[in-house]
Design a protein with these regions (language model features):
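Active-site environment of divalent metal-dependent phosphoester hydrolases
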Residues: 2-5, 39-46, 76-94, 114-116, ...
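Divalent metal-coordination and catalytic microenvironments
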Residues: 19, 35, 83, 128
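Short, isolated positions within intrinsically disordered regulatory regions of eukaryotic proteins
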Residues: 20-22, 30, 130, 151
Length: 160
């Protein structure tokens, strides 16, 4: 039963098959692959495991492991999500590792409308710069026009 306040993600088997076909095609050149969804994976952010209130229903849900395994089969996958309305200083990019040894990056984006935790002024988020061997996330407060270098992140790419 789905919590009426907090929801989860559902992906049909047809969509999983489509995603696998797309990932197969896009992974051939070794360039980064960006996947975007509203929900984060379980136990990847402080609010999904470091809370008095269990809020795993704020996450992908029952298909968590299936989606993890699919994304981890490919190099240079970056999964962008949100939902928590948490900003810089609370959630950093998280490397999701599966038992078989594959991994990908989960990047939880700030809310552009209202931030409940962390750096509160909105709109603020990361600007993404992709280079041959790394991806740079530069934090910016768009209301003030200031760069927030203390929250910048650099993620290495697998180079074939």
């Amino acid at each position: 039963e789905v919590d009426p306040i907090r929801h989860t993600l559902h992906i049909s088997e047809e969509s999983f098959s489509w995603m696998e076909e797309i990932l197969d095609a896009w992974s051939e050149d070794g360039k980064p692959i960006f996947a975007v969804s509203h929900y984060l994976f379980e136990n990847t952010a402080p609010l999904s495991f470091d809370s008095e209130i269990i809020i795993n229903s704020n996450t992908i849900g029952e298909q968590d492991q299936q989606l993890r395994e699919l994304l981890a089969d490919y190099e240079n996958v970056f999964y962008f999500c949100g939902h928590l309305h948490a900003s810089f200083g609370v959630i950093e990019p998280y490397q999701v590792v599966v038992e078989d040894g594959g991994s990908f990056w989960e990047i939880n984006l700030s809310s552009l409308k209202a931030s409940a935790r962390g750096y509160l002024p909105v709109p603020s988020t990361w600007l993404l710069y992709v280079y041959e061997d790394e991806m740079v996330l530069r934090a910016r407060d768009f209301a003030s026009g200031k760069w927030l270098t203390q929250f910048d992140q650099v993620l290495e790419l697998s180079v074939n």
